[in-house]
Amino acid sequence: LEDLSDEDGYDASDALDPGPGATDAMHEPAWNEVAVLAGKLDAIMKALHEFLERQVGTPRSQNMLTRRYQLYQTLLGLFTRTILTTFKSRHVQFIMFWFASLNHEFADMFLGTLLSKSLYAVPTAGTSETGESATILRIAAASYVASYVARARYIDASTTRMVVLNLCTFMDACLEAFAAQGATAPPPGAREHAVFYAVTQAVFYVFCFRWRDLRDGAVSDAPSFALDDE
């Protein structure tokens, strides 16, 4: 990967070296540095996508099917540990979105993971997912639920309704708990309600894109999974 540079052989390490006469103003990333790093990211993602395409193919044997599931579990683990916790990641996650499109079980597992992280996360011993870090992780997971369901064309109407039902059930439980606390409840807008607001925003976002699928009896026009198991 160190050889991935632009056509002129310019490497990111060149842009990181301010050279003689540098000033404090040059501490901020220059546009050419960003362009080089973006080019490398594109090249890495392209190489990864081509590798995964060669690996998955159309399953013609049990070994190939097993390999596909193993790769998906690896990607899902990397997404949960790294991408989900990365602030404003805007590109790398689309490798995960693409792989999830290959099989309806992958899409279900991905959504299940996101819903679990956002709605039902329970801190466990020996992890750092406590307090504010756990809240941030849950907010990020809710945001991914919204963008994934709203924009993934292969997510059908029934799945969309299932996701929104889970989100609304969580919101309803939060409102009941808030009412039960009475005067001791944190005021609206307090940090304690951050996850509730994130989930509410997710519902509104999904509604804006998929409101037709939320109607009773709606039939989705989502395309079938191109590489689904036969």
What name fits each language-model region?
Residues L1-R81:
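Alpha-helical repeat/alpha-solenoid scaffolds of the HEAT/ARM/MIF4G superfamily
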Residues L84-T85, S133:
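Solvent-exposed loop and edge beta-strand segments that line ligand/cofactor-binding
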Residues K88-H91:
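Generic helix N-cap/helix-start motif at coil->alpha-helix transitions
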Residues Q93-E230:
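Eukaryotic scaffolding regions of large macromolecular assemblies
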